[in-house]
Amino acid sequence: MPTLSQLVKKGRQTLTEKKKSPALQGNPQRRGVCIRVYTTTPKKPNSALRKVARVKLTNGIEVTCYIPGEGHNLQEHSIVLVRGGRTKDLPGVRYKIIRGALDTAGVAKRKQGRSKYGAKNA
């Protein structure tokens, strides 16, 4: 507990809230280039091969992004649009690639929730 004179000299330091997606620097989306496209296994109770990509953003920051939906056309040097939003069972994956934007194709034969996967009306 600080004394009154210590508070007069220094004052209280306000706690800054931790950002959930710091690499976006306050922007809703950011463009980037795929460096590596690969699969990872999720945390303990789940089992799968999750599709992820290492992306270098336009601000120079490198992030790991999840590729949502079934099947994708991404490869090295693909230009992608990245948004915030973590994948709970993949540690360190705090971003998602937006389907149907730039080089990323939408999910084929998608009937429900099309807007989330960039699928056109068939």
Swiss-Prot record:
Keyword Lyase found: no
Signal peptide: none
tRNA-binding found in the keyword field: yes
CDD domains associated with the record: Ribosomal_S12
Pfam families: Ribosom_S12_S23 (PF00164)
Entry-linked SUPFAM superfamilies: Nucleic acid-binding proteins
Gene Ontology molecular-function annotations: rRNA binding; structural constituent of ribosome; tRNA binding
GO biological process: translation
Annotated region described as Disordered, given as residue ranges: 12-31
GO cellular component: ribosome; small ribosomal subunit
Record keywords: Ribonucleoprotein, Ribosomal protein, RNA-binding, rRNA-binding, tRNA-binding
Disulfide bonds: none
NCBIfam families xrefs: rpsL_bact
Function recorded in the entry: With S4 and S5 plays an important role in translational accuracy. Interacts with and stabilizes bases of the 16S rRNA that are involved in tRNA selection in the A site and with the mRNA backbone. Located at the interface of the 30S and 50S subunits, it traverses the body of the 30S subunit contacting proteins on the other side and probably holding the rRNA structure together. The combined cluster of proteins S8, S12 and S17 appears to hold together the shoulder and platform of the 30S subunit.
Quaternary structure (record): Part of the 30S ribosomal subunit. Contacts proteins S8 and S17. May interact with IF1 in the 30S initiation complex.
Similarity comment text for this entry: Belongs to the universal ribosomal protein uS12 family.
Record's protein name: Small ribosomal subunit protein uS12
Organism taxonomic ancestry: Bacteria, Fusobacteriati, Fusobacteriota, Fusobacteriia, Fusobacteriales
Gene name per UniProt: rpsL
